[in-house]
Design a protein with these regions (language model features):
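Conserved small/polar residues in nucleotide/adenosyl-binding loops
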Residues: 1, 328-329
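Metal-dependent peptidase/peptidase-like ectodomains
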Residues: 1-61, 73, 123-210, 215
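His/Asp/Glu-rich mid-to-C-terminal helical/loop segments that flank catalytic regions of hydrolases
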Residues: 57-109, 231-239, 244-266, 279, ...
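Residue-level signal for secondary-structure boundary elements
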Residues: 96-99, 116, 120, 145, ...
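Extracellular/periplasmic ectodomains of large secreted or surface enzymes and adhesion receptors
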Residues: 107-131
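Phosphate/adenylate-binding glycine loop and adjacent helical scaffold
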Residues: 227-228
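Sequence-level signature for long, low-complexity tracts enriched in small/hydrophobic residues
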Residues: 274, 294-296, 300-301
Length: 331
């Protein structure tokens, strides 16, 4: 959940660099949890890292016996040094940290629009709260856009003064904007605190995205069971939180690998502390459905009741989360 605007502008203005990748360079967000930079970002320090997860090197060589000098690539080495050295120089020539919050708000809008489009009449409360979220987000988006344009103008002026050798005026402009940068970094930290959550696979999402996904999966599982399609129901339940473990392990192992996530000291969980929204325990539903499938038993009344209660719980949590975003976090 990160700004890409400045980096894209930086890439567009680069001179000819060493050609190492046929696909050239692209910018992705958010930072993934495997990177140390994730911990820096959620602590309020804007950060970035080179992404190598999509290439064959990550799959076949990284952290293996092949990760050695024999596979050194001169072009890649040079490109990384050129690219990131120039980026450091570019950032050094800004008077204010170039943070643009409009991509965050665009993603909230997209999620809100999806929820509004799919909610049924029985979910009028969600629809009403989501419409409010969209309204507040659109207002915040306009302010964020204006703020970034002002920051960009300041940095353009600062760069010009440095290029002219007018150090006295450049230093004055830099000093005048310390409070602006301070407020931007405060906003960045708030963004990380309020919006950065992770699912049980370490993927980064907004809190309402995780809840909305669970609601959809639970609704699909209910619909499947009502049609006696136990295979489809199990397929959906498998994707809810950490319930994949219920299919593969006994209850002790399931609870161990679920509970230990929540029962760690805070100083051991810097990157993930408070980022999980919770866990919908469907262990007994899974085991009962697997048993009934084996025995050709199609009486799913107990499982349907439990799943519907879980659905209601996730819906209440979604309403609370959407309200928090609308009435607090975007103000």
């Amino acid at each position: 959940i990160r700004d890409r605007h400045y980096i894209k502008e930086y890439l567009d203005g680069l001179p000819e660099l060493t050609k190492a990748y046929p696909e050239m360079t692209s910018v992705t967000a958010p930072i993934e949890t495997w990177s140390d930079d994730f911990s820096m970002a959620i602590a309020g320090i804007p950060s970035m890292v080179n992404d190598f997860t999509g290439g064959s090197f990550m799959e076949t060589h990284y952290h293996s016996q092949f990760d050695n000098d024999d596979f050194y690539d001169e072009a890649v080495y040079r490109l990384h040094h050129e690219l990131f050295t120039l980026l450091i120089l570019a950032l050094d020539e800004t008077a204010v940290v170039p943070l643009d919050f409009t991509p965050v708000l665009e993603r909230i809008l997209a999620g809100g629009s999806e929820i509004t489009a799919k909610v049924e009449e029985t979910q009028e409360q969600i629809a009403a709260i989501t419409k409010k979220l969209i309204q507040v987000t659109e207002e915040a988006q306009e302010k964020a856009k204006q703020s970034y344009e002002e920051t960009a103008a300041i940095n353009t002026r600062y760069y010009a003064l440095l290029a002219e050798g007018n150090m006295q005026e450049a230093e004055q402009l830099f000093a005048e904007n310390r409070e602006r940068e301070k407020q931007l970094l405060v906003k960045f930290k708030q963004e990380q605190d309020h919006f950065v959550r992770i699912d049980w696979y370490g993927e980064v999402f907004f809190p309402h995205e995780i809840l909305w996904k669970n609601i959809g999966l639970l609704q699909d599982s209910v619909n499947a069971l009502e049609q006696s399609d136990v295979d489809k129901a199990l397929e959906k339940i498998y994707q809810v939180d950490n319930n994949a473990y219920a299919f593969m392990f006994d209850e002790y192992v399931y609870r161990h690998f679920t509970d230990y996530v929540f029962n760690q000291p805070k100083d051991r969980l810097k990157w993930g502390y408070g980022r999980l929204l919770g866990h919908e325990d469907l262990y007994h539903v899974v085991k009962c459905l697997l048993k009934k499938r084996k025995e050709a038993d199609t009486d799913y009344r107990e499982e349907l009741h439990y799943l519907k209660e879980c659905y209601k719980k996730q819906t209440r949590r979604l309403c609370e989360t959407l309200k928090a975003v609308s009435y607090t976090h975007l103000r």
